[in-house]
Amino acid sequence: MVMMLVMLSLHGTAARLNRREWDSVIQLPTEPVDDEVGTRWAVLVAGSNGYGNYRHQADVCHAYQLLIKGGVKEENIVVFMYDDIAYNAMNPRPGVIINHPQGPDVYAGVPKDYTGEDVTPENLYAVILGDKSKVKGGSGKVINSNPEDRIFIFYSDHGGPGVLGMPNAPFVYAMDFIDVLKKKHASGGYKEMVIYIEACESGSIFEGIMPKDLNIYVTTASNAQENSFGTYCPGMNPPPPEEYVTCLGDLYSVSWMEDSETHNLKRETVQQQYQSVRKRTSNSNSYRFGSHVMQYGDTNITAEKLYLYHGFDPATVNFPPHNGNLEAKMEVVNQRDAELLFMWQMYQRSNHQPEKKTHILEQITETVKHRNHLDGSVELIGVLLYGPGKSSSVLHSVRAPGLPLVDDWTCLKSMVRVFETHCGSLTQYGMKHMRAFGNVCNSGVSKASMEEACKAACGGYDAGLLYPSNTGYSA
């Protein structure tokens, strides 16, 4: 039965360019000279941990190497990653991380700015704001940018309606993140900013709450109500090397990076990359096992050249500004099922290790059991609050485009804490239910009523280690 469930679920100060010699060579007659781009800064965030989430840290390490090749200085790139992959006992190439089946090592040289327990929302916010006094642990590196500087932020992980995951609780909540961006803008700490987000329902982080006047442009891997996808996975085309049991990358993430690596970024615009990534992430506009790449904020920035944010690699001088040669169709797995795919691969490859195979089967069983518990509990809570006739329509209601997930974000956090207190931790899978909690708030249910429903729905359930006392609250 478990097997059936699994198969079904299945400084940059690059400015003042010291590179004027080759800049002048590649400058086209019709292109204006732009030697004054300010300092390029970047924040790269892998919001997960565990070998089954290999792909998120691989994405971030790959992004770091791309920026370094583009001339962005290490001192101006801040990296958040748990750093439990490269030397993980399951990694077939110790000390090496790859983001493509035939790709090079992307781990070497990546700075350990914020790792392990230091990968937190609080540190992320402090880094973006350039507030060293609020940073706890880590290298202490922050985005100490000026009004003429440009900032690039890339985030790769699991997500849910209104939230982005972190390896250490709580989640990143949309309104908190937007508030940080508003503060950064108010401080005059940058000229323009570009943000790329890889996560399920990542459009919900910005839908209805992202202002257009912050000089910030955003693209997300998915809209406000759909999954994003892992790729380069075992058993798929193209597959990772045979010894790998986990996905190497994420569809949106590898799409933008492989696009940047194969084009002249002094000639390719932000808009051209958006169009290319949108097509590839949709699986050639079929949206069959693909997602809708969205854009938010100040879309005037899309006319700018990508080198202003990613830098420029001299090796790409003769590359085209844009073409459609990247692989258009990829086999993928949705982010939430990638965990099961990883465990199933481990199970299948343990035929000659009966004890290990039994242990992995127990892990799969517990994972599926907790997922079923979360799904069933949320549905039962809806029935208790609204009755069997209205429950589903209320919990799963999607607001019109342009409206935020929830009107009261404090209420959302409160409802999440009530649920986790009585029903156990949401985990990276349970993020999918954030819309239901938001709709509970939007419908005016009191905290007391929610508490009664959670007690009734989850009374007697033993979540084992998956309680907030062990994992921390998601809000």
From Swiss-Prot:
Broad enzyme group: hydrolase
Glycosylation sites: N300
Disulfide bonds listed in the record: C233-C247, C411-C441, C423-C458
Protein family (similarity comment): Belongs to the peptidase C13 family.
Pro-peptide region(s): 16-35
Record field: pH dependence: Optimum pH is 5.0-6.5.
Chain positions of site Required for post-translational maturation and enzyme activity: C247
Catalytic-site annotation from UniProt: H158, C200 (nucleophile)
GO terms for cellular component: vacuole
PANTHER family: HEMOGLOBINASE FAMILY MEMBER, LEGUMAIN
UniProt subunit comment: Homodimer.
Protein name as it appears in the record: Legumain
GO MF terms held by the record: cysteine-type endopeptidase activity
Xref: InterPro entries: AE (IPR043577), Legum_prodom (IPR048501), Legumain_prodom_sf (IPR046427), Peptidase_C13 (IPR001096)
Pfam families tied to this protein: Legum_prodom, Peptidase_C13
Superkingdom of origin organism: Eukaryota
Signal peptide range in chain numbering: 1-15
Protein role: Asparaginyl endopeptidase able to cleave almost all peptide bonds on the carboxyl side of Asn residues, except at the NH2 terminus or second position or with N-glycosylated Asn. Responsible for the maturation (circular permutation) of concanavalin A from its precursor, by performing both cleavage and cleavage-coupled transpeptidation to form conA.
Entry annotated with the keyword Glycoprotein: yes
Catalysed reactions listed for this entry: Hydrolysis of proteins and small molecule substrates at -Asn-|-Xaa- bonds
Regulation: Repressed by various protease inhibitors including p-chloromercuribenzene sulfonic acid (PCMBS), N-ethylmaleimide, kininogen, elastatinal, cystatin EW and leupeptin.
UniProtKB keywords: Disulfide bond, Glycoprotein, Hydrolase, Protease, Signal, Thiol protease, Zymogen
Its EC number(s): 3.4.22.34
GO biological process, one term: proteolysis involved in protein catabolic process
